[in-house]
Amino acid sequence: MRKIFLTAVLMLGAMSMSAQLATVQNVQRIDAGVSVDKPVISADGSFVVAQAGAKGIVKITADGTCTTVAKASGAYNLRLTADGQNVVFAAPEYRSNHLRYVSLKSANLATKSVRTLVKASRRLNSGVGIEGNSVTAVENGKARVQSLDGTKAVRSAVASINYGHLDVTVNGKTRSIDPQGRGSYIWPSISPDGQKVVYWLVGRGCFVCNLDGTGVQRVGELRAAVWAGNDRLVGMDEVEGTAQQVTASSLRLYDLASGVSQTITDDTVKAQFPSASADGSRIAFTTPEGELYIVTLTK
């Protein structure tokens, strides 16, 4: 009888771990006529912005309409403001001294006007915080906050990587939290409510912790994870190949409260670098070939 009971418990446990978090309604390829990289989807899921090589930063809608927002061919770390009216990005440049400098800029999606938020610097941190239409950047460990719409600027938390350290800036103060000690931390992202940070520790996997480095929770093999709401993550799983050539990769949804996860793409597409809408119902991703896809989910 005890064996039967234990077997039933194990079966129920296995069923709960494989329970479905969402229903995949559609996985749609968006043919915009350009190759893109690392898309960022809007809060409402109606469009994405992405880097498109020589075309610069582009806006792409669900029907494939593609418009150039800014001629910034080397731009990276794209972020959208809450209202979807501006894209913030890092713009690198090389000067006559052969050193690399990075400035932080914003571009208005409607007017295409580009504004410099932080002048080119050798010490601009990789992370950016967005709160409404306020942008918080960190230069040489010091927070700099600006409003894009003339309203009072609101400072937000920022997570960034500094020589492999996981740095978190809260209330204008920056410190390395390195939750598991010295290592190589990458892919940090702060939750929408500003309470937690997800990151990848090379050789160890994906983790979530509080902004002070406490409360570490292991997520597993979830690469380049981003938030799909405050309690869920989506990232790359079952990655095969090399950094130069990915031969297989799927996307997996993970629920922090239950520990349940669900694969949301199949092996017909090499899905990488996801971005989720505010409610997690739409997830954009690209392939190594620069194809853009959007996954639509329902709970």
What are these regions, as identified by a protein language model?
Residues 1-4:
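Positively charged n-region of N-terminal signal peptides that target proteins for export
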Residues 6-7, 119:
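General helical structural elements
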Residues 7-8, 267:
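Intrinsically disordered, low-complexity segments enriched in polar/charged small residues
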Residues 9-18:
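Hydrophobic h-region of N-terminal signal peptides that target proteins for export
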